[in-house]
Amino acid sequence: MLELEAGHLRATIHPEAGGIIASLDRRGPDGRLHKLLHAPDGAMPSTAAPNMMGSWVMAPFANRAFDGVVDDGVTRFLVPENNPRGGGNIHGFGWQSAWAILGHTGSHTALEHRRSAGPDPYRYRVRQEISLDDSGMTIALSITNEADQALPYGIGHHPWFPCAADTRLGLTASGALVFGEAFRAIGSEPLAEGGPYAGKPVFATGRETAWSFLGWDGTARIETPSTGLAITLTASESLRCPVVWAPAGADFLCVEPQSHAIGSPSEKAAREAGPLRRLQPGESLDGWLRIAPEAI
């Protein structure tokens, strides 16, 4: 386990378990630690199922490849199924892999995950740099195609944020996927006036929430008056297809900056709305996100 500290912020990272940022805490004026990422007491990261905590990399694509299919309209192949609930591959391979430590200081670390073998053509290198400063955490991502052919790629990060009964989410987007069964896209639609979170409503609805937004402006704000904290999430232009998800009654919410829409690896409607990026051998796809807390 690695620890990073800067000012009032502290993070723990597990390179051996998907390079996960297992916790990010802020020490308040009262000396107490306030969790900025959902991290249940005593929970340890696993590579058996996607971790419902912290924040972690999605690569070489984000979210679902239904039935294990990757098809960008040019190249089609199968990837191993890894979703414990069935139905294909979820979030790629990075979250299940051990990451090498390239460097580590008190407030910064660089990690790398490399895939050089497998039953599918994916061969790549992913680099994740995590930096803390006095006001927040910045995560820089880069994936490089190391295969001998052009292939479709995507990246993303999957933060899990604490959510209370009074938590509000603010996010503006111009469109979203339309889901059929099991989050499989059947089309896309424009959103009037910035979408359902433009007015920063209370997030909790008592039912499952699932959105794959398009045309995001790159900023989301999560405010929880009962804790006195707000979190601002920002992301690069390359990660402007965020997923917002939470099951009914959850004490967390997910806002996942990613480079493509849910199901783009396998679903034509998703691919047409927010496609993967086709990388030539040696070409890279980069992105960044930042999580910044403040008192309210």
Residue ranges of predicted features:
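Glycine-rich active-site loops that engage anionic ligands at enzyme catalytic sites
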Residues: 224-262
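Extended, loop-rich substrate-binding clefts of extracytoplasmic carbohydrate-active enzymes
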Residues: 3-5, 75, 80-134
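Short Pro-Gly-centered flexible turn/kink motifs
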Residues: 70-78, 141, 277-294
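Active-site/ligand-binding surface loops and adjacent short beta/alpha elements
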Residues: 79, 151-152, 160-236
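Acidic, contiguous internal or C-terminal segments within carbohydrate-active enzymes
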Residues: 4, 11, 15, 113-153, ...
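Acidic-aromatic substrate-binding/catalytic surfaces of carbohydrate-active enzymes
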Residues: 10-76, 82
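A conserved acidic, glycine/proline-rich C-terminal tail/linker
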Residues: 254-276
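A short, structured loop/turn motif at beta-sheet edges
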Residues: 27-31, 70-75, 102-108, 131-136, ...
